[in-house]
Structures are given as structure tokens and as C-alpha cells.
């Protein structure tokens, strides 16, 4: 049995999956964001409950909006401050008495998609999230590739490529990022970035859904903005694809529901790739909000 925990700033979602990777149990509980011992006890309590229910010792995986220090095992999780600076994995292993795997939630999203029936035979899958922020995860041969420092999928903190600056023109917005730097992809390719770029060029604050609705109604400013954003997205995706060369790319997050992306990217990306390279297949993620808990559980698939 595979146990997955999607640990967020408000709730912990638990899922149990059998050997056929079918979900057989679900539970949601509030996240103890400020009390570390209560956080440990909450996770351990769910493990014990479902061990008893299924008469087994499930394999445990956690996905969190943060990362584990590769050297000392301490966590950096902004939305769950109780765990920041603490060796969460080691403490859980000591409390539960078995191995625990921890990954960034974007990597779990990518892993969930990579183990979908239609993608599980693909050698490599990139999962890219166009949500409140922009991030991603890399899966090679069915396993998350997180790198030496566990930051291999932190694509949102790569900077805009030169072609993107030229495309945005002399009046290009220099947007700050929560990491403290400027020019991160997170600030441009996210739903938030979609809105900020519109505001920069037109001096109006609008929600992404309002801009897209205006585009669908043929409004000229929205059309100009969407064309600018699609080209920006193509440039940045091509830059990422040149380095990662994934076989398939699955898009998640709110902005991934903008169907025009799937029409425009295959047409716009190729001119920014090497002449021998082809644009990978780009699809909408299938598993939505359940991707985090699925991917966390699947961290233990051999």
C-alpha cells in the first residue's frame, strides 16, 4: 500500500493507493502550521489509522510547498512555518518506525502525471504549473529528478531569457519575486504574472479570467496582451525545453485551462529551438487537485 500526504498551508490531504495504483482511501485534516509536534503526531496518527485499516505497513511519501536541505535534512516550507528549520523526514521516521520520502509538491504533481496510464511508458515527463506561481517538476524513467540540492524542478526561479526581454520591448516590466530577486519566470509565466503584465502595459488591474473573457469577446487590448503573453510563454518554454528535452509536458494550474495555449505553443515554440529539436507534446494535466497526493504516494514506486 502506498500512502501519500499533500501537506499545504491549510490542510493535509491523505490518500492510500493499492498495488494497482488505485485510490482506496481519502482523508483531509487541518494542517498544524505552528505546532511542530502536533504536525508530526497528525501525520503519524493517519499512518497508524490506515495501517490498522488495511492490516499493513504502508509506504509513506510527503509532498510540501518547499524543500529539504540536501545536507542536513532541515526543511524550508513558507506555508508551514512549524516545519521550517526542522528535520521533518528524520523525525517522522523515528516516530513511525519506517522510511519516509519527501518532495516538493510541484515534483509530486509531475510524478502523478508521469504515472498516468497514458504517460507511464514515456521516458521523461515535465510537469509545469501555471498557477498563482510558476514552477515545475522533472520525471525521468518514472522517478523524480531533484538534483544535488533538491532544486532541479525550481524552474520558476530561472530568469527571463534574452529573447524574452527583446520581445517585451524597451518598456519591459522588471518584476520582483518572493525569492528576493528580479526577473524570475515565476513572476511572468504565472496567472499572477499574466495579470501584472497586462497592468504594466495598459494601466488597469484585471483578473486573468476577465482578460481571457475579453479576449474571447474580441476586445483589442486583451488580444494584444494575449498575443504578447503567448509569445513570451513560447520563448521561455523553448528555453526550458532546450535544457530539459522532455518527451511530454503536462500543464497544471489555473492558467492551464486557457485552451489557446495548446493551439499556440506547438506553432510558436519551434522557431526558438535548435534546428534538430522538435517541440514536445504539450497536454493539460489530468489529475488536477489530486495530483499532489498521488505523486507523494508514488514517490515509493520502485
Curated annotation (Swiss-Prot):
Write down the SUPFAM superfamilies for this protein, in alphabetical order. Answer: Actin-like ATPase domain
Which pathway does it serve? Cell wall biogenesis; peptidoglycan recycling
What InterPro entries has UniProt attached to this entry?
A: ATPase_NBD, N-acetyl-D-glucosamine_kinase, ROK, ROK_cs
Broad class of enzyme this protein falls into: transferase
Any single GO BP term? N-acetylglucosamine metabolic process
Chemical reaction(s) catalysed: N-acetyl-D-glucosamine + ATP = N-acetyl-D-glucosamine 6-phosphate + ADP + H(+)
Residues involved in Zn(2+) binding: 157, 177, 179, 184
Q: Which keywords does UniProt give here?
A: ATP-binding, Carbohydrate metabolism, Kinase, Metal-binding, Nucleotide-binding, Transferase, Zinc
Q: What is its EC number?
A: 2.7.1.59
User: Which GO-annotated molecular functions does the record name?
Assistant: ATP binding; N-acetylglucosamine kinase activity; zinc ion binding
Looking at the Swiss-Prot or TrEMBL record, what is one Pfam family this protein matches?
ROK
Residues annotated to bind ATP:
4-11, 133-140
Question: Highest taxon of the source?
Answer: Bacteria
Indicate yes or no for the key word tRNA processing. no
Query: What family does this chain come from, according to its entry?
Result: Belongs to the ROK (NagC/XylR) family. NagK subfamily.
Task of the protein: Catalyzes the phosphorylation of N-acetyl-D-glucosamine (GlcNAc) derived from cell-wall degradation, yielding GlcNAc-6-P.
What name does the UniProt record give this protein? N-acetyl-D-glucosamine kinase
Native species: Vibrio atlanticus (strain LGP32) (Vibrio splendidus (strain Mel32))
Amino acid at each position: 500500500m502506498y500512502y501519500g500526504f499533500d501537506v499545504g498551508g491549510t490542510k493535509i490531504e491523505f490518500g492510500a493507493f493499492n498495488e494497482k495504483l488505485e485510490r482506496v482511501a481519502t482523508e483531509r485534516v487541518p494542517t498544524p502550521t505552528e505546532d511542530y509536534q502536533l504536525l508530526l503526531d497528525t501525520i503519524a496518527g493517519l499512518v497508524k489509522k490506515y495501517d490498522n485499516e488495511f492490516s499493513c505497513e504502508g509506504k509513506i511519501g510527503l509532498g510540501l510547498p518547499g524543500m529539504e536541505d540536501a545536507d542536513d535534512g532541515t526543511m524550508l516550507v513558507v506555508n508551514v512555518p512549524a516545519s521550517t528549520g526542522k528535520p521533518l523526514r528524520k523525525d517522522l521516521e523515528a516516530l513511525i518506525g519506517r522510511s519516509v520520502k519527501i518532495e516538493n509538491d510541484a515534483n509530486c504533481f509531475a510524478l502523478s502525471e508521469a504515472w498516468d496510464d497514458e504517460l507511464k511508458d514515456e521516458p521523461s515527463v515535465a510537469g509545469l504549473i501555471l498557477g498563482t506561481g510558476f514552477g515545475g517538476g522533472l520525471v525521468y524513467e518514472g522517478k523524480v529528478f531533484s538534483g544535488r540540492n533538491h532544486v532541479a524542478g525550481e524552474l520558476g526561479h530561472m530568469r527571463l531569457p534574452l529573447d524574452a526581454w527583446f520581445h517585451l520591448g524597451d518598456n519591459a516590466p522588471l518584476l520582483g519575486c518572493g525569492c528576493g530577486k528580479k526577473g524570475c519566470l515565476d513572476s511572468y509565466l504565472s496567472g499572477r504574472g499574466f495579470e501584472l503584465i497586462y497592468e504594466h502595459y495598459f494601466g488597469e488591474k484585471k483578473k486573468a479570467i476577465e482578460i481571457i473573457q475579453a479576449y474571447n469577446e474580441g476586445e483589442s487590448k486583451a488580444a494584444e496582451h494575449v498575443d504578447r503573453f503567448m509569445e513570451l510563454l513560447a520563448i521561455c518554454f523553448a528555453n526550458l525545453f532546450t535544457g530539459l528535452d522532455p518527451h511530454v509536458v503536462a500543464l497544471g494550474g489555473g492558467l492551464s485551462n486557457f485552451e489557446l495555449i495548446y493551439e499556440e505553443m506547438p506553432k510558436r515554440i519551434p522557431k526558438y529551438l535548435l534546428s534538430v529539436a522538435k517541440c514536445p507534446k504539450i497536454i493539460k494535466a489530468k489529475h488536477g487537485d489530486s495530483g499532489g497526493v498521488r505523486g507523494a504516494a508514488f514517490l515509493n514506486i520502485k
